[in-house]
């Protein structure tokens, strides 16, 4: 093989690797990780004793992850013109021209279709339909209808983001119980303070993109107060699993400790604001949800 052919082959491999990475980025893997984590926790909590069926867990995890990735790709496609105007998102594949809209749409369709097929045939139809509804809720209701029109986009659109544990629960039981809805309620209450912390230190970005996020429409002080109020609501909601005897003392201790930590962040964000601390609060909120759901799982298998 000539030196020229070797170099061409190497360049082709690099180009293929870059394209694969671009498709991977479309799925918003960090967000997807949290989605899948909460769904898997829902699967384990749904089984009163023992462990869920491993085949169901694997199939449901793959199906939910694929559809979540497809929803993220559709979000990137629909908001490509907005992403190009924002510092936080201008380096995504579509604004950079690494992928074309048509191939992004094809990728989302294949990924989502595969995920729904897996859920229908190897999990159960209820989980498939709930996952499809979640996809529509995020990619259409939130992205197209709510986000560009109302500062309450996060509050209303948070319903789709709160669905993962419900999907996991339905995957192993074939039904949606009151306990599953409690898990939904926790994420639903968590979503506004989580995203508004981000919106506070990225408010100039959102204003430049023309998106009516709360700091843009109502100002930073009102948004900081809203973060504090919703964090108080979240604290109360996280006590419900113990109050309903879904979880025990171990979870209660963890929920109270984590809740106090989140409240301290929210109070400081309100009383002594800085962009750096808003970023810190945003990051803490992600860790908070991971640890809270981990506490639910620990309490489930290690009851005191």
Swiss-Prot record:
GO cellular component terms attached to this protein's record: plasma membrane
Keyword terms: Cell inner membrane, Cell membrane, Heme biosynthesis, Membrane, Transferase, Transmembrane, Transmembrane helix
Protein's membrane topology: Multi-pass membrane protein
Swiss-Prot/TrEMBL catalytic activity: heme b + (2E,6E)-farnesyl diphosphate + H2O = Fe(II)-heme o + diphosphate
Keyword Transport: no
Molecular function GO terms recorded: protoheme IX farnesyltransferase activity
GO biological process, one term: heme O biosynthetic process
Protein family: Belongs to the UbiA prenyltransferase family. Protoheme IX farnesyltransferase subfamily.
Miscellaneous: Carbon 2 of the heme B porphyrin ring is defined according to the Fischer nomenclature.
NCBIfam families from the UniProt entry: cyoE_ctaB, PRK04375.1-2
Protein name: Protoheme IX farnesyltransferase
């Amino acid at each position: 093989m000539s030196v020229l052919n070797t170099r061409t082959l190497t360049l082709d491999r690099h180009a293929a690797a870059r394209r694969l990475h671009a498709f991977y980025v479309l799925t918003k893997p960090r967000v997807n990780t949290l989605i899948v984590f909460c769904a898997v926790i829902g699967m384990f909590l749904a089984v009163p004793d023992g462990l869920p069926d491993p085949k169901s867990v694997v199939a449901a995890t793959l199906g939910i992850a694929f559809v979540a990735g497809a929803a993220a790709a559709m979000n990137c496609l629909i908001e490509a013109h907005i992403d190009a105007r924002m510092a936080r998102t201008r380096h995504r594949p579509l604004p950079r021209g690494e992928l074309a809209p048509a191939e992004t749409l094809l990728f989302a369709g294949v990924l989502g279709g595969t995920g729904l097929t897996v859920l229908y045939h190897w999990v159960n139809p209820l989980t498939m339909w709930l996952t499809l509804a979640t996809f529509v809720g995020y990619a259409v209701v939130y992205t197209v209808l709510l986000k560009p029109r109302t500062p309450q986009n996060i509050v209303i659109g948070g319903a789709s983001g709160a669905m993962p544990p419900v999907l996991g629960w339905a995957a192993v039981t074939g039904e949606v119980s009151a306990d599953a809805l409690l898990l939904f309620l926790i994420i639903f209450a968590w979503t506004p303070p989580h995203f508004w912390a981000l919106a506070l230190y990225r408010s100039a970005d959102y204003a430049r993109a023309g998106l009516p996020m709360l700091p843009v429409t109502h100002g930073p002080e009102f948004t900081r107060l809203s973060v504090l109020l919703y964090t108080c609501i979240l604290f109360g909601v996280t006590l419900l699993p113990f109050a309903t005897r879904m979880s025990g003392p171990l979870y209660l201790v963890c929920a109270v400790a984590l809740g106090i930590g989140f409240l301290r962040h929210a109070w400081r964000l309100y009383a002594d604001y800085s962009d750096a601390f808003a970023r810190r609060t945003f990051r803490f909120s992600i860790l908070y949800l991971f640890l809270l759901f981990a506490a639910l799982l620990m309490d489930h298998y290690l009851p005191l």
